[in-house]
């Protein structure tokens, strides 16, 4: 099955979900219909594992906009396969979990599952894209679908603010990324990613290389919640827990990392890129791990935990980027090891973090709270979630016999080897190791502290009242399956390493097959070495801090109020006030003012073009023959048009406006264009009647008195616009030896079977344009109808 067919299949499922929204009896099954999408994609991508391992990559290219080199280019290599498997397999768990989490009585299920499937479609589109513009389209689609999912419970103010904040930050990064893609096109002349990476040595010497890197980093850092753009992720936790488990731990937040990995053969040629990514990753890792201890909401803890873990992966992506410069050197094995660790931890993090979010969701759903100050001794009420969250949290902390331990060891090993790399000195290595270890200590602390507070703190009936709480098996099943994978991967890591991670490494290295020999063999025991010593230190210090310190009392008062998010809110409020003032100044409910502004901008653009290029010489001028009748009709049209400016009665204005149209009809007849005359007559008659009929539904608001200054502006704009239109007509008549498109229509109109060139153009040559013009009118009408029938939707949260 082609990659295009897979995407089409997902779109068909989305259409089925939309159809179910019209039938309440079927709406409750929307989740199970939506579940088909990740199941199909998972089966499809798992079937491709052997082929991709043998370098048999799938690719599809469908021309779209050839002149701009924008095509539907899709490519399935090792890197896109690994991410597609994560998106699809985690998707199965999340979609099934959502069927148990959401209520068919209280929630609009088809709407939710449509948004969730749209997001999955967008993420798969990102990782399969082999065209930069196509990737950007899918990139922004993830922002849109994320906005819709976060604001799913739209009556909640936190959901609305979180959705807007995440949308603004990620779209800002997306626009920066688009600028980077445009720079790449300027440097290479192509939008095809495979071709771009093949020109890496040429691009690195271009003047736009460094600006392009900064644009890429803005896109990646905003999407993957890196400091200081991390602030949207905690706010996004207002979304339903299935959304948090899928978007904000396993998939969407990994899109920025995917971007950097995909372009590592190009970006890694710059040492500045390596330094920035490594530094930002370390800061993010440290900041996230410390801030997680300040949270009382379990989802808040997991949000900052995700930020910290993403920073950890980003550090390895940054250090490993040097592989692009040293593919043939002896130290290439170190870079390969670091990149392998980044991919390995990316996979591990998706598993244990998704399990943690699901566990928190079950606690919230059944116990009614996520506050660690309220929840206590939950191991008795939720034995399965005690097991799931304990194992997943310990894996995140890097405890032995769990998958997180292996990738955490690789991370520490990578940090200790940076001193051997040309980009880092001994002092910088010590600083990197120090920050990495401190961040890891706090990671261990909040992971253990979270489990201790929720499941092992002594029960206090004054704080939390035990209710009829149950722990359904179907609800717990997805998290239990993910929990089982945590120790399984520890004992058989190389099954995943050789089948999934090594092919992904090939893609990161731009197809260098030597990387197969350089890829590490993951062992559970490496003997006593520096990374193991650092792990022991982390476990000891983290255990002491988690058990002996009451972090609920540490971060209080002013310390707790320090937040980067507050800076964002302050800037947001100022921009909002500024926009409100500008809006009130511009939007004064005067349609003619809006038209003047629109035409004014158009005239400025045309005028600027005339100034830059200059007016062409008019050496030929074609003017149709005209007689006294045409002159009289033209004078009548102009006279009525000018009189409309000074007339105050609405009905008179409408009638005179119709008269202008009928005079133009006579002008067409005089010019021997009967078809145009008939069309003009019909349109003018219908619009005039509609105008008059609409008066019965419009308020009787008298028109303001004539203002001499305002009327002069209107006349001036009209005359200037007429002058520009006439000048453009003259310019188009100067062929300069080039063939005109009119000649094509004149010669080819007989092929359409039409007897009139105008009909042939409207009905055949630009039939799609005519069709879409009609669709635009229909959509506009539906929009107006919706606004007229809009009722303020207020009420309680849909969960209640």
Swiss-Prot record:
<feature type="transmembrane region" description="Helical">
    <location>
        <begin position="387"/>
        <end position="407"/>
    </location>
</feature>
<dbReference type="InterPro" id="IPR046806">
    <property type="entry name" value="MrpA_C/MbhE"/>
</dbReference>
<feature type="transmembrane region" description="Helical">
    <location>
        <begin position="527"/>
        <end position="547"/>
    </location>
</feature>
<dbReference type="Pfam" id="PF00361">
    <property type="entry name" value="Proton_antipo_M"/>
</dbReference>
<feature type="transmembrane region" description="Helical">
    <location>
        <begin position="331"/>
        <end position="351"/>
    </location>
</feature>
<keyword id="KW-1133">Transmembrane helix</keyword>
<feature type="transmembrane region" description="Helical">
    <location>
        <begin position="300"/>
        <end position="320"/>
    </location>
</feature>
<feature type="transmembrane region" description="Helical">
    <location>
        <begin position="712"/>
        <end position="732"/>
    </location>
</feature>
<dbReference type="Pfam" id="PF20501">
    <property type="entry name" value="MbhE"/>
</dbReference>
<comment type="subunit">
    <text>May form a heterooligomeric complex that consists of seven subunits: mnhA2, mnhB2, mnhC2, mnhD2, mnhE2, mnhF2 and mnhG2.</text>
</comment>
<keyword id="KW-0813">Transport</keyword>
<comment type="similarity">
    <text>Belongs to the CPA3 antiporters (TC 2.A.63) subunit A family.</text>
</comment>
<feature type="transmembrane region" description="Helical">
    <location>
        <begin position="273"/>
        <end position="293"/>
    </location>
</feature>
<feature type="transmembrane region" description="Helical">
    <location>
        <begin position="78"/>
        <end position="98"/>
    </location>
</feature>
<feature type="transmembrane region" description="Helical">
    <location>
        <begin position="768"/>
        <end position="788"/>
    </location>
</feature>
<feature type="transmembrane region" description="Helical">
    <location>
        <begin position="595"/>
        <end position="615"/>
    </location>
</feature>
<keyword id="KW-0050">Antiport</keyword>
<dbReference type="InterPro" id="IPR025383">
    <property type="entry name" value="MrpA_C/MbhD"/>
</dbReference>
<dbReference type="GO" id="GO:0005886">
    <property type="term" value="C:plasma membrane"/>
</dbReference>
<dbReference type="Pfam" id="PF13244">
    <property type="entry name" value="MbhD"/>
</dbReference>
<keyword id="KW-0812">Transmembrane</keyword>
<dbReference type="Pfam" id="PF00662">
    <property type="entry name" value="Proton_antipo_N"/>
</dbReference>
<dbReference type="InterPro" id="IPR001750">
    <property type="entry name" value="ND/Mrp_TM"/>
</dbReference>
<keyword id="KW-1003">Cell membrane</keyword>
<dbReference type="InterPro" id="IPR050616">
    <property type="entry name" value="CPA3_Na-H_Antiporter_A"/>
</dbReference>
<feature type="transmembrane region" description="Helical">
    <location>
        <begin position="241"/>
        <end position="261"/>
    </location>
</feature>
<feature type="transmembrane region" description="Helical">
    <location>
        <begin position="213"/>
        <end position="233"/>
    </location>
</feature>
<feature type="transmembrane region" description="Helical">
    <location>
        <begin position="1"/>
        <end position="21"/>
    </location>
</feature>
<feature type="transmembrane region" description="Helical">
    <location>
        <begin position="33"/>
        <end position="53"/>
    </location>
</feature>
<feature type="transmembrane region" description="Helical">
    <location>
        <begin position="676"/>
        <end position="696"/>
    </location>
</feature>
<dbReference type="GO" id="GO:0015297">
    <property type="term" value="F:antiporter activity"/>
</dbReference>
<feature type="transmembrane region" description="Helical">
    <location>
        <begin position="424"/>
        <end position="444"/>
    </location>
</feature>
<protein>
    <recommendedName>
        <fullName>Putative antiporter subunit mnhA2</fullName>
    </recommendedName>
</protein>
<dbReference type="GO" id="GO:0006811">
    <property type="term" value="P:monoatomic ion transport"/>
</dbReference>
<feature type="transmembrane region" description="Helical">
    <location>
        <begin position="627"/>
        <end position="647"/>
    </location>
</feature>
<feature type="transmembrane region" description="Helical">
    <location>
        <begin position="472"/>
        <end position="492"/>
    </location>
</feature>
<dbReference type="InterPro" id="IPR001516">
    <property type="entry name" value="Proton_antipo_N"/>
</dbReference>
<keyword id="KW-0472">Membrane</keyword>
<feature type="transmembrane region" description="Helical">
    <location>
        <begin position="651"/>
        <end position="671"/>
    </location>
</feature>
<keyword id="KW-0406">Ion transport</keyword>
<feature type="transmembrane region" description="Helical">
    <location>
        <begin position="118"/>
        <end position="138"/>
    </location>
</feature>
<feature type="transmembrane region" description="Helical">
    <location>
        <begin position="167"/>
        <end position="187"/>
    </location>
</feature>
């Amino acid at each position: 099955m082609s990659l295009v067919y897979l995407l089409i299949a997902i779109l068909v499922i989305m259409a089925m979900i939309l159809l179910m929204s019209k039938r309440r009896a079927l709406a409750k099954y929307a989740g199970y219909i939506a579940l088909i999408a990740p199941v199909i994609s998972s089966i499809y991508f798992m079937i491709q594992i052997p082929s991709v391992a043998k370098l048999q990559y799938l690719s599809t290219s469908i021309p779209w906009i050839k002149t701009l080199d924008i095509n539907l280019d899709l490519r399935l290599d090792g890197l896109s396969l690994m991410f597609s498997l994560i998106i699809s397999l985690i998707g199965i768990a999340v979609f099934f979990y959502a069927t148990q989490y959401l209520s068919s009585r209280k929630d609009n299920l088809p709407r939710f599952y449509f948004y969730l499937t749209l997001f999955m479609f967008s993420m798969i589109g990102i990782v399969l894209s082999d065209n930069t513009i196509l990737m950007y389209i899918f990139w922004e689609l993830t922002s849109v679908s994320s906005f819709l999912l976060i604001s799913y419970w739209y009556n909640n103010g936190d959901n609305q603010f979180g959705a807007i904040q995440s949308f603004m930050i990620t779209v800002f990064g997306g626009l920066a990324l688009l600028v980077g893609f445009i720079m790449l096109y300027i440097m290479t002349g192509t939008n095809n990613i495979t071709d771009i990476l093949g020109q890496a040595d040429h691009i690195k010497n271009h003047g736009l290389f460094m600006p392009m890197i900064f644009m890429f980093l803005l896109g990646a850092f905003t999407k993957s919640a890196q400091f200081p753009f991390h602030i949207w992720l905690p706010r996004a936790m207002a979304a339903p827990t299935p959304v948090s488990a899928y978007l904000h731990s396993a998939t969407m937040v990994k899109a920025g990392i995917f971007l950097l990995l995909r372009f590592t053969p190009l970006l890694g040629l710059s040492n500045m890129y390596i330094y920035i990514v490594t530094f930002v990753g370390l800061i993010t890792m440290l900041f996230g791990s410390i801030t997680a201890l300040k949270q009382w909401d379990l989802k808040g803890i997991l949000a900052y935990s995700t930020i910290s873990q993403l920073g950890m992966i980003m550090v390895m992506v940054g250090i490993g980027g040097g592989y692009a410069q040293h593919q043939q050197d002896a130290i290439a094995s170190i870079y390969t090891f670091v990149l392998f660790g980044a991919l390995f931890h990316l996979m591990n993090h998706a598993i244990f973090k998704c399990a943690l979010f699901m566990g928190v969701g079950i606690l919230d759903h059944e116990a009614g709270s996520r506050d660690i100050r309220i929840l206590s001794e939950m191991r008795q009420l939720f034995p399965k979630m005690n097991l799931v969250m304990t194992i997943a949290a310990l894996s995140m902390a890097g405890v032995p016999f769990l998958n997180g331990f292996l990738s955490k060891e690789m991370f520490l090993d990578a940090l200790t080897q940076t001193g051997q790399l040309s980009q880092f000195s001994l002092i910088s290595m010590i600083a990197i190791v120090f920050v990495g270890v401190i961040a890891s200590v706090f990671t261990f602390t909040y992971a253990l502290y979270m489990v201790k507070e929720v499941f092992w703190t002594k029960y206090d009936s004054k704080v939390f009242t035990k209710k009829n709480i149950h722990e359904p098996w179907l609800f717990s099943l997805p998290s239990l399956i993910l929990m089982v994978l945590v120790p399984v991967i520890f004992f058989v890591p190389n099954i995943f390493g050789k089948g999934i991670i090594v092919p992904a490494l090939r893609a990161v290295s731009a197809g260098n097959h030597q990387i197969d020999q350089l890829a590490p063999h993951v062992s559970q025991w490496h003997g006593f070495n520096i990374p193991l010593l650092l792990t022991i230190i982390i476990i000891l210090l983290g255990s002491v801090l988690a058990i002996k310190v009451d972090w609920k009392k540490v971060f209080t008062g002013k310390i707790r109020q320090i937040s980067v998010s507050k800076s964002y809110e302050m800037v947001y409020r100022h921009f909002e006030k500024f926009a409100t003032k500008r809006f009130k100044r511009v939007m004064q409910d005067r349609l003619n003012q809006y038209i003047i502004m629109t035409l004014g901008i158009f005239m400025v653009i045309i005028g600027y073009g005339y100034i830059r290029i200059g007016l062409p010489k008019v050496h030929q001028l074609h003017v149709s023959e005209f007689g006294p009748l045409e002159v009289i009709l033209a004078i009548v049209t102009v006279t009525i048009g000018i009189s409309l400016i000074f007339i105050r009665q609405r009905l008179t204005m409408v009638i005179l406006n119709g008269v202008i149209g009928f005079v133009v009809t006579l002008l067409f007849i005089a010019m021997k264009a009967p078809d145009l005359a008939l069309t003009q007559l019909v349109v003018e008659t219908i619009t005039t009647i509609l105008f008059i009929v609409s008066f019965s539904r419009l308020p009787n608001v008298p028109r303001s008195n004539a203002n001499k200054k305002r009327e002069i502006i209107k006349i001036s704009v009209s005359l200037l616009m007429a002058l520009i239109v006439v000048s453009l007509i003259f310019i188009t008549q100067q062929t300069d030896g080039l063939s005109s498109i009119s000649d094509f229509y004149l010669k080819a109109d007989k092929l359409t079977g039409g007897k009139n060139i105008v009909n042939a153009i409207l009905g055949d040559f630009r039939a799609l344009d005519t069709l879409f013009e009609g669709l635009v009118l229909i959509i506009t009408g539906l929009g107006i109808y919706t606004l007229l029938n809009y009722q303020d939707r207020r009420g309680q949260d849909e969960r209640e």
